[in-house]
């Protein structure tokens, strides 16, 4: 059974094939409908704008029928196990995408389902977002070769998936943030064992210098305890001064929603180097490609 849970579950060639398909679907070179006659469930333990709309539209464009399930529609909170939910949904659906609070929910669902499971986001990773981001970088710079990615702030789920991508595609990744907010040591060790060039620093200027991409995310994610996060993260705000340290054609990226004046200034996110709305659009195309490769028998 093919699932899409983490980037590290795939080899580089397989992910590149998905990116190639995403580009063809976006350009109109691929107008196939590989999900024709298929029903794809969408489970949301956390609400979403981009994930909900991009998957629902994408499933429909590929010829499938989306079936949306919120946490209130399921029995998970009232005693039914994740394992049983996976077994039941397998009798009705051809695949399921889940946006979950805990990564373990996704892995347990996949272990017990007889249909493909796609990770729409968990507390540990966000692989669909990174596929859209990689597509955006290729559009802007032609390829991923020689890319220097600067991540600012929290070593969160999105950062974790960037680490996996760096190990698989071989670009340089610089993670600038407070030491207390660094990504898991085991994940960093795995990536470095794969040959990834990953730099950890508490100096945002050093991380941004000569970077081709500067990326950040909200400082306080949905469900997180704010605590001292905003104070701790303030030195890692994406500003125009920091963008000037990067390459002249560097792009700014953010998975959205963004809080202007916090992790990024309005001048940057609304400026000419910002690619945030290209990223948002590419969620649609990247996820269509993922679904085609994971769900269809013809990819």
Residue ranges and their predicted role:
Residues 1-53, 57:
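Positively charged, low-complexity intrinsically disordered leader regions
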Residues 192-267:
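Rossmann-like adenosine-cofactor binding region
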Residues 67-89, 112, 164-165, 183-196:
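Active-site-proximal loop->helix
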Residues 45-57, 141-216:
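Glycine-rich phosphate/diphosphate-binding loop of Rossmann-like nucleotide-binding domains
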Residues 39-40, 44-92:
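Active-site cofactor/substrate anionic-group-binding motifs, chiefly glycine-
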Residues 249-250, 256-299:
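Adenosine-phosphate binding glycine-rich loop
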């Amino acid at each position: 059974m093919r699932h899409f849970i983490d980037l590290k579950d795939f080899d580089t060639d397989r992910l590149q094939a998905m990116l190639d398909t995403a580009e063809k679907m976006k350009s109109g070179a691929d107008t196939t409908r590989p999900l024709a006659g298929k029903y794809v469930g969408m489970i949301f333990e956390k609400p979403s704008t981009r994930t909900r709309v991009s998957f629902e539209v994408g499933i429909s464009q590929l010829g499938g029928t989306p079936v949306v399930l919120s946490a209130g529609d399921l029995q998970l909170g009232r005693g039914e196990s994740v394992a049983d939910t996976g077994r039941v949904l397998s009798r009705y659906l051809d695949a399921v995408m889940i946006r979950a609070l805990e990564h373990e929910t996704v892995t347990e669902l996949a272990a017990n389902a007889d249909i493909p499971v796609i990770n729409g986001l968990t507390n540990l990773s966000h692989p669909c977002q990174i596929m859209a981001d990689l597509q955006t970088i290729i559009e802007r710079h032609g390829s991923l070769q020689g890319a220097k990615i600067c991540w600012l702030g929290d070593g969160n789920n999105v950062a974790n998936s960037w680490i996996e991508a760096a190990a698989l595609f071989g670009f340089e990744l610089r993670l600038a943030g407070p030491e207390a907010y660094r990504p898991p040591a085991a994940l960093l060790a795995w990536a470095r064992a794969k040959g990834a060039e990953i730099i950890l620093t508490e100096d945002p200027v050093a991380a941004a210098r000569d970077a081709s991409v500067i990326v950040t995310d909200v400082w306080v994610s949905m469900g997180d305890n704010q605590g001292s996060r905003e104070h701790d993260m303030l030195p890692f705000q994406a500003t125009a001064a920091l963008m000037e340290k990067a390459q002249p054609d560097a792009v700014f990226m953010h998975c959205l929603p963004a809080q202007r004046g916090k992790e990024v200034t309005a001048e940057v996110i609304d400026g000419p180097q910002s690619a945030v709305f290209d990223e948002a659009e590419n969620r649609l195309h990247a996820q269509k490609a993922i679904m085609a490769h994971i769900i269809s028998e013809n990819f």
